[in-house]
Amino acid sequence: MKNNMKKFSLLLFGLVLLLAACGGGTESKGDEKNNASESGSKGEKTYKIGISQYVDHPSLNAATDGFKKAIEESGLKVEFDPQTAAGDNSLNTTIANNFVSSGVDLIFANATPSAQAAAAATGDIPIIFTSVTDAVGAELVASMEAPGKNVTGTIDLHPDTISKTVAFLKELGVKKVGMVYNAGEQNSVAQVTEVKKIAAEHGLTIEEASAATSADVKQATESLVGKAEAFYIITDNTVVSALESVIDVANTNKLPLIVGELDSVARGGLAAYGFQYFDIGYEAGQMAVKILKGEAKPAETPAQYPQNLKLVINKKVADSLGIDVKDTWGAELLEQ
């Protein structure tokens, strides 16, 4: 009897061990499954990117397209939230604050006012800008080489653009240059200041007119007729968004219109030293990819100048003004 009880106890003990082992094995597989699920979720994270664009016009639109293209080519899963401020700084601020409240992973700010609004809204969320002329002057970065904060991006003014443009105006025989810009845009003020400095060195004078809104552009341009021998429109968002008004005045009065970027040449400007806005948007997108992947930090990512500066001349406009394009200019002709 004792022997039977002993055998039964041993059998029961063995059964308990077997069940414990099976239970442990089941728990281990469950853990592995959960871990795999978590790992899969991390690998398939969808990033949220808020896009704040100051105003709707071809150059800024091209930059946004370039940014999206770089993101799409990276293979990252991304949800874009595109917003346009329509040139309204108060709306710019609202857009930036909404992005912060919704917890986006990154903000893409297209143009100086949008970048400034985003930088004021957050010191934590990475901000990548483009179409900014003077990032240091706008207090977006400490320096081009070492931004120092949560903000970096691409510039829309090559260091040689203004000097080459002024030299080209002189080559055309122009002595008095009319400039229309929004005095409330920091990037425009910085450019006009530089143009005045370089123009004086070449013996040219600058006649100015300010336009606070796109509706003011035509009247401001007309006020310079009789004072200027040519117009030079820089990368001012307010004026470029209403460029057709400037083109109309220039054409009516047979005055050369030099513009600040290539998209405006296609719209009817005579010429520009410039680059493709799509390209600087694309380069900004490449920065964003590295930051989202944890491969870089905005504070340590140098802001970049545009590459491939070239002179493009609208052949149709040149012909209408009786301007002979010289081979020595090394210009690329836009045939329309």
Show which residues each predicted segment covers:
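Bacterial lipoprotein signal-peptidase II cleavage site
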Residues: 22-43
